[in-house]
């Protein structure tokens, strides 16, 4: 049996993540963990560093992001390079919908088999109607099945029933917010400070408002550590259900290809320029014209003149700074 941490938040998840990419890589090397995900909330800023570090340390990197869809938290994992590009588009659309609190609607999501979606159940259980609509868009959808303490008993029973009713497979997860088992207290302090709460205030886990985790088990676990945890703490989950959730965890890892990104100056990916365009600038200008035809072409001439001036100035700035 192999277990992989499929939901991992780094310090790029400013409000909730505490572990750094370097710390996670270090733990993987110490514990012999061969696969690692990065699924920050509303952020893919750490992806390039993550891929580089994983490749240098012979770790299979799984690229992901956690987004809100119809008020449900969902972790998306890229199965391939096309899935990576789809995740970038979904993240962009979510910020277009609301910059302060990004979200997606099911209509924002196109039908795809390039990504895996893990619907969170730890904080809020999805409705059957939502699952039905969402599964019409994404081929590979799983329900999060976590064994962590807190209200696990009620959650596991309810999620199991939901899985059976909707024919949605369960996948075992260990939501990871920090790298080391000794970092729980610092993680709690970090979450409280960012949201301007005192540690003396009642946490959400006890009906209060202070952000907090349900338990001190949210660190990066090896397969053996998970096995030990299950043996010592989990007696209320049928073995058949638990074993299948573990099998599904490995099945997800197996279906995911290693995403490879080429770099320029060690910083950014090389864009794909479709024919007949010769370079990124000509392609970019064509995209601008496409947007112009959709948005500006029917507007009054004085508006068009103002837009042309603005586009010209911004294009000069973009090009002079070598952004394309």
Where are these predicted regions, by residue range?
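Phosphodiester-processing cores and adjacent nucleic acid-binding clamps
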Residues: 1-324
């Amino acid at each position: 049996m192999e277990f992989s941490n499929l939901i991992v938040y780094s310090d790029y998840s400013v409000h909730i993540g505490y572990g750094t990419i370097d710390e996670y890589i270090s733990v993987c090397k110490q514990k012999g963990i061969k696969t690692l995900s990065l699924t920050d909330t509303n952020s893919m800023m750490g992806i390039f560093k993550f891929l580089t570090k994983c490749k240098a340390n012979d770790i299979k990197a799984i690229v992901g992001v956690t987004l809100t869809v119809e008020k449900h938290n969902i972790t998306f994992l890229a199965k391939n390079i096309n899935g990576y590009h789809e995740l970038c588009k979904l993240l962009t659309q979510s910020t277009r919908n609301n910059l302060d609190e990004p979200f997606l609607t099911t209509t924002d999501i196109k039908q795809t088999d390039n990504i895996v979606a893990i619907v969170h159940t730890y904080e809020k259980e999805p409705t059957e109607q939502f699952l039905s609509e969402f599964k019409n868009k994404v081929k590979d959808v799983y329900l999060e099945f976590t064994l962590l303490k807190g209200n696990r008993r009620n959650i596991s029973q309810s999620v199991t029933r939901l899985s059976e009713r909707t024919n949605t497979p369960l996948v075992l997860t260990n939501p990871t917010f920090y790298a080391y088992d000794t970092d729980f207290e610092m993680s709690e302090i970090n979450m409280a400070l960012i949201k301007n709460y005192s540690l003396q205030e009642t946490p959400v886990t006890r009906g209060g408002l202070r952000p907090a985790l349900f338990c001190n088990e949210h660190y990066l676990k090896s397969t053996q550590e998970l096995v030990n945890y299950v043996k010592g703490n989990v007696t209320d989950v049928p073995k058949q259900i638990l074993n299948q959730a573990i099998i599904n965890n490995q099945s997800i890892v197996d279906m995911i290809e290693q995403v490879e990104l080429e770099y320029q100056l060690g910083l950014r990916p090389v864009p794909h320029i479709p024919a007949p365009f010769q370079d990124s600038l000509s392609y970019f200008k064509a995209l601008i014209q496409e947007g112009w035809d959709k948005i500006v072409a029917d507007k009054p001439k004085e508006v068009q003149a103002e837009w042309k001036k603005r586009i010209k100035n911004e294009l000069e700035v973009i090009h002079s700074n070598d952004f394309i």
